[in-house]
Design a protein with these regions (language model features):
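Conserved Walker A/P-loop ATP-binding site and its immediately adjacent core
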Residues: 49-68
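Hydrophobic residues on the short alpha-helix immediately C-terminal to a glycine-rich phosphate/catalytic loop
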Residues: 16, 35-43, 64, 146
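Conserved pre-motif I regulatory segment
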Residues: 1-25
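Conserved small/polar residues in nucleotide/adenosyl-binding loops
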Residues: 173-175
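SF2 helicase catalytic motif II
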Residues: 122-158
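Conserved helicase ATPase motor motifs in RecA-like P-loop NTPase domains
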Residues: 27-29, 136-137, 151-170
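Inter-Walker segment of RecA-like/P-loop motor cores
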Residues: 75-118
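Walker A/P-loop
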Residues: 20-39
């Protein structure tokens, strides 16, 4: 099913296409997930890519997975968290590595801020893009190091939120 973005979502998507990082601020209910999905669809048209989608809770990671897979197919999916899912799931670094190296398709990894460090501890994983949902959680002391480590190994990183924590040094894509 094709996604029809609203004007503010189109503006955010165009800004993302021009920059490899940014904070996308859209009000609650404004369609942040559809912006992520459309960006990922375009990115996954090319050569082999690994996408990481980070959420604050397992339930939200599972919901994002359902939303993404409603619009994106022909990808391998891994969940890196301790919750139940219908997809391959693990929190063991060696199993994450094995899954990553054994895949012959584009990959999408759904995880939580709590389990993100398991991905950054997997040395062979090269991440093409990371989408952090409810990104204000990424600033918490408990998750900051894992998020920082992930930003070092991924080509593109986007932080989606309706409630930003703003620093004067951040690059913002504000809708």
């Amino acid at each position: 099913m094709p996604i029809r973005l609203r004007p503010h979502q189109e503006t955010a998507l165009k800004s993302m296409q021009l920059s490899h990082h940014g904070q996308i601020i859209v009000p609650t209910g404004g369609g942040k997930t559809f912006i992520m999905i459309q960006h990922a669809k375009e990115l996954l048209k090319g050569q082999f890519k690994t996408v990481v989608v980070v959420a604050p809770r397992i339930l939200l990671a599972n919901q994002l997975s359902n939303d993404f897979l409603e619009h994106i197919d022909n990808v391998d999916v891994l969940h890196v968290h301790s919750g139940e899912t219908h997809h391959t799931s693990t929190t063991k670094t060696d199993e994450i590595e094995e899954w990553h190296l054994g895949s012959v398709k584009n990959q999408i990894i759904f995880t939580t801020y709590h389990s993100l460090h398991k991905i950054t501890s997997s040395p062979s994983i090269e991440v093409s893009v990371m989408y952090c949902d409810e990104a204000h959680n990424s600033c918490s002391k408990q998750f900051f190091d894992a998020v920082k480590d992930m930003t070092m190994i991924c080509e593109r990183k986007y932080f989606f939120t309706a409630t930003p924590r703003i620093s004067h040094k951040l690059s913002l894509i504000h809708i």
